[in-house]
Regions:
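Short, surface-exposed glycine/acidic/tryptophan-bearing loops
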Residues: 110-157
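Sec-dependent N-terminal signal peptides of Gram-positive bacterial secreted proteins and lipoproteins
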Residues: 1-24
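Short acidic, glycine/serine/threonine-rich helix-capping segments at coil-helix boundaries
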Residues: 51-64, 98-107, 125
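A short alpha-helix/helix-coil micro-patch that ends at or immediately precedes a cysteine
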Residues: 78-119
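Extracellular LysM carbohydrate-binding repeats and other cell-envelope/extracellular binding modules
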Residues: 26-29, 38-77
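Disulfide-stabilized extracellular recognition modules
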Residues: 150-183
């Protein structure tokens, strides 16, 4: 199914608007040969989110051509914030001669779940009472990797503040500059 990535980095962004934003939805008309999984990949949305947005579908494994599905989409301000964090991180990496990190919608999805979990359970830690370690969480979301790291932030209002906070932390800076990470 999923191919083994050369290496991954997992960056978690915590901010008030990321936690409280509501997902917008669009409608998708199923065409022959589609599955909910294929639709999830097409829109870069988790399968579980599509299933949740479509309670009228009694069996998610059976969808039919011309059936209309609701597709939840992320708020553009959230994805823009995340992309800016990646861009600023890549500036730091480039200054050290490292390859840029790629945006990865599946890792971003995991990060949003972790962010929501920290908000719901009122903690700030790399170990989640719900998901365990970041590495277990990545595996449990079906993502294969060879190496991974986690940077978390809380209270920063801008992407620059997030990246500067990480840069001023030895452990987070090491993750930012890890040459083994690609996503």
């Amino acid at each position: 199914m999923k191919t083994l990535k050369k290496s991954l980095t997992l960056i978690f962004i915590i901010s008030l608007f990321c936690i409280t934003a509501e997902a917008k939805t669009i409608q998708h008309t199923v065409v022959k040969g589609e599955s909910m999984w294929k639709i999830a990949v097409k829109y870069q949305v988790g399968l579980s989110e599509i299933i949740s947005a479509n309670p009228q579908v009694s069996n998610p494994a059976l969808i039919y051509p011309n059936q209309v599905l609701n597709i939840p989409l992320m708020d553009e301000s959230i994805t823009s914030f995340e992309q800016q964090v990646i861009d600023l991180t890549n500036e730091k990496r480039a200054s050290r001669g490292l390859k840029p990190l790629n945006a990865n919608w599946e890792l971003s999805r995991v990060a949003r779940y972790k962010s929501q979990d920290m908000a719901n359970n009122k903690y700030f830690s790399h170990t989640s009472p719900t998901y365990g370690s970041p590495f277990n969480m990545i595996k449990n979301f079906g993502i294969k990797y060879r190496s991974a790291g986690e940077n978390i932030a809380y209270g920063q209002r801008t992407p620059a503040q997030v990246v500067n906070s990480w840069w001023n932390s030895a452990g987070h800076r090491a993750n930012m500059l890890n040459a083994n990470y690609s996503d």
